[in-house]
Amino acid sequence: MKQKNCHFKKIIGIDPGKSGGICVIEDNKRMMAYKCPADVHEMCTLFDNIIKGTDISYLSVYIEKVWARPSDGRVSVFTFAQNYGHWEAIVASKGIEPEYVIPSTWMKHFNVPSGLKKQDRKNHIKGLANNIISYCYDYDDYYKGNKYQFRGKVTLATADAIMIARYGIDKTT
């Protein structure tokens, strides 16, 4: 089912890498972010908890569209592709058609300087995500007890997902 271009109750941003994360912004007020769970069963459980009680017409999912680079090792490429496929399957199994966004698109939207070394870029994005949550969102114990629970601290694992979800908010409002 194609998502409608209107205000959504929940915007979900997914950084699909094994060291990535998932972020949900509810009603543009409350935000939760989680590192990527260790296996597909935990990924399913987390996604189910995030969307529980929400009609899919009120969900919008943004997945970062990324690909392997020639310099990536075979094992890391396989692990990444497997994780990427897991997220796609989990989202599709709920009848949701995600929006795909390439990194340069959402980074340009937030004026992330091009040409930064990878670690510098990651730290810059983490700083942007910290600014966003500090000024815009409440985070609480809504999913208390979940071992992947967001505790108000942006990490390198959750920063991209937070920015992707915020990009989704900007594109749907």
Please provide the spans of the model-predicted regions:
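Phosphate- and other anionic-substrate recognition elements at nucleic-acid/protein interfaces
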Residues: M1-T173
